[in-house]
Structure formats: C-alpha cells, structure tokens
Regions:
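Short, well-ordered beta-strand elements
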Residues: 324-325, 333-352
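N-terminal signal peptide c-region/cleavage motif recognized by signal peptidases
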Residues: 15-17
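Short, surface-exposed loop or secondary-structure junction motifs
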Residues: 68, 121-330
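Active-site SXXK
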Residues: 34-37, 51, 57-59, 80-107, ...
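Short, gly/Ser/Thr-rich active-site loops of penicillin-recognizing serine hydrolases
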Residues: 288-295, 301, 315, 352-387
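Short, conserved catalytic-motif segment at the N-terminal edge
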Residues: 26-81, 103
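Bacterial N-terminal signal peptides that target proteins for export
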Residues: 1-6
Length: 387
C-alpha cells in the first residue's frame, strides 16, 4: 500500500530537483554593484560619487568622478564628506541609548530639558515631546525663519538663537497629529539630550556613536588635515567650518569608510549580529494613515511609516520594503537605504553639479537593493532594471 504513495511523492519532487539543478548560482555583491553604480553616477549628474554596499559578509566600495572639479582624483574610502540629514539618524541613536540608560524617556516633554527660563510652546496644553522631535511630528517649521541668504551650511541658528526664537513661537498643529520635516526640531533635540546627560553633545556623540565603532573621521569639527580631504562640489560647495550650530540636524562630517562601519551594525554578518538595541533604533512609530498629513518625507518614494529619523517605504513594483533616509547640504546629497531582514544596505554620497538630481540616484539605489535581495537563494524578489 505504501509503494504508490512513495512513487507519487518521488514523481512530485522530480521537477523541483530538476529546477534546483539549473538554478543559477548567486552573483557576488560586487558584480551587482558594478552593474548599477556607474548608471547611478551618470544618472545623477554628480561631480563625484562614493558608494558602500553591504550584503551579509560582503562589503563593496565603488566611486566615480572627482573629489573636486578638474582634479581627476576619484573619491576614496577616506574622502571627507558631509552626511547632512543622515546626522538625524545618529541623533536618534543617542536618544534611544540615553533612554536605555534611564536618563530620559522618549515621551518626556522638551520643556523638561530646556535652558533655565526658556519657554517651549504647546498646542491646547499638549507639549512637544522628544519622540515628536525625532519623528518630525512636533509642529515646528522646517527651518527657523530669518536666516541670511547664501550663508555657509550648518552654521545657523546657534543654540542660543534657536531657543530665543522658540520662546516667541506658536504651534499651528498638535504635536503627534501631522508630520512635517523639521531640521530645527532635531537641533533642539540634540540640545535636550546634552542637557539630560549633563555632557556636551560632541562628547556624548563620540562616547555613544563614533568611538565604539572606530569612526575616526566622523566629527563636527574637522582638522585642517581632514578638511584637505573634503570633497568639493561644482555647485553649492560650502567652507569646511565647524558645524556645531547644526549639531543634531545635519552637521556631521564623515567618510564612506566610517559610514560603512555605522551601517554594518544594522545588518547581520558572521562577525556582526544585529542586537535588540538596533531593532529599537529602527522602530516605526507612525503609520502614514495615523497622521493628518505628511510633508517633506517622500523624496525617494512614498513614505508608508515614520520612525525616529528613519522612513519606511512598503513593497512596491517588485521592490522589497525599504527603510531609508535622505540628506543634502553644502553641495552634497546623501542616501542610506536597507532591507535589514535580508542584511543588505547601501550608502551613497554625491557632490552636486548644475545637472544633479536626487531621484535618479535614489531610484538606482532602490533597484540595486531589490536585486541584491533577489540574488539571495530562496528569495522571490528580482529586479532587472538594467539589461
């Protein structure tokens, strides 16, 4: 009685075995990166580009163009860059780590950590909380009004100037009701974290972010030697100043190598294991449908959920769900995107020319991520965006 059943089972497995025998071997991550990186560079119209891709145990670096117009030197792993608004991800990391130490609560009101005598606006009695600052739901504007045109990036407003402005400000919406991108909010958040810890923010940043990962070139105050390595854009370049004024929102200088080290902590490999702490850093706080409106969050694609700096785009058109963050300033455009459950991530930085556009760069990175995921054995996703 068992024989027909076994024969039927064997016959049913034959096609699967046959398919397994002809299935192509997965490509090296470097082969996929090579296919996409040059297209991303030329599509973006950049002066120079550096890219770091991680796929499990594989880390790939690629670069194109020049570190400054006309010098014919490709960007290097240690070229100094501005990560711009990717700085916000590190500010949120400091916040989460202080919360784990018990030094703050994510739902603490900003007023708890305001300078003595400072006023923090509320909306019908609802306070701005730290979690609102980190999710762009504070009700504060994108920038503090009144900045001088053509000023260097990330040098205004200073700490005293933003708190003086805040004392006169009024909120137009309840915190937590809508999302509107706010650089000002993140600088106030870094001020609050420094006060809560009783430590200057640069020292806190070094203690919690850069020193544990060996990020030796990541700073707010680059040395003359580091400034000599700063990539320079054809359009929008800014002096290599200290950026302590924009310490929470966009002031971080770094290198592709340091950013690869930082990105690796979010992705499992044989030597790195994603921790529960890292899971908390990428917790999604608001679904889009929980908010009255969402402004300034859809640059590389529609934001379906917001985390603490991170933005999640759900699966679409053959692409997997992607968690990402964009940045730009001082002639730089940056983008970090990853699919953590598949241990793939990409960081890219470009310097601008008059022709530079963000979307061709981010679309190329998103397609590369999808193909890296599809290249993994057993994954159903595959994108062939470049023949």
């Amino acid at each position: 009685m068992r024989t027909p059943y076994l024969l039927a089972l064997m016959v049913s497995l034959l096609p699967l075995k046959s398919m397994a025998q002809v299935a192509p071997d997965p490509l090296l991550a470097s082969q996929i990166v090579d296919r996409y990186a040059e297209h991303i560079f030329y599509g973006s119209g950049a002066t120079g580009m550096a890219l770091v891709a991680i796929d499990g145990n594989q880390r790939v670096f690629a670069s194109f163009g020049e570190t400054r117009p006309g010098n014919n030197i490709r960007p290097q792993k240690d070229s100094l860059i501005r990560i711009a608004s990717l700085s916000k991800l590190m500010t949120s990391e400091v916040m989460v780590k202080l919360a784990e130490r018990g030094q703050i609560r994510l739902d603490d009101p900003l007023s708890k950590y305001a300078p003595p005598g400072a006023r923090v606006p509320t909306y019908n009695g609802q306070p701005i909380r730290l979690i609102n600052l980190s999710t762009h739901t504070s009700g504060l504007p994108r920038e503090q009004p009144g900045g001088k045109a053509q000023r260097p990036v990330f040098v205004w407003p200073t700490k005293s100037e933003r708190w003086a402005w805040l004392a006169r400000a009024n909120l137009k919406a309840a915190p937590g009701s809508s999302a509107a991108y706010s650089n000002l909010g993140y600088d106030l958040l870094s001020d609050a974290l420094s006060r809560a810890a009783g430590t200057p923010y640069p020292a806190l940043f070094q203690q919690l972010i850069t020193r544990p990962l060996g990020m030796k070139d990541t700073t707010f105050t680059p040395s003359p030697e580091q400034c000599g390595r700063l990539m320079v854009a054809e359009k929008g370049a800014s002096p290599c100043n200290n950026t302590l004024a924009a310490i929470g929102s966009g002031g971080v200088y770094s290198t592709p190598d340091d950013m690869g080290r930082w990105m690796q902590q979010f992705l499992n490999s044989s030597v790195n294991h994603r921790t529960p702490q890292i899971d908390r850093l990428q917790t999604l706080i608001y679904r889009r449908d929980q908010l009255n409106k969402v402004e300034g969050m859809d640059v590389p694609g529609k934001a379906d959920a917001l985390g603490m700096g991170w933005v999640f785009m759900g699966p679409k058109n053959g692409r997997p769900g992607i968690i990402q963050k964009t940045g730009g300033g001082g002639g730089f455009i940056t983008y970090m995107a990853m699919v953590p459950q598949h241990n793939v991530g990409v960081f890219v930085v470009v310097t601008r020319s008059p022709l530079t556009r963000f979307t061709p760069m981010s679309d190329g990175v998103n397609n590369m991520l999808a193909e890296l995921v599809g290249n993994q054995l057993g994954s159903p996703m595959m994108v062939q965006a470049i023949p």
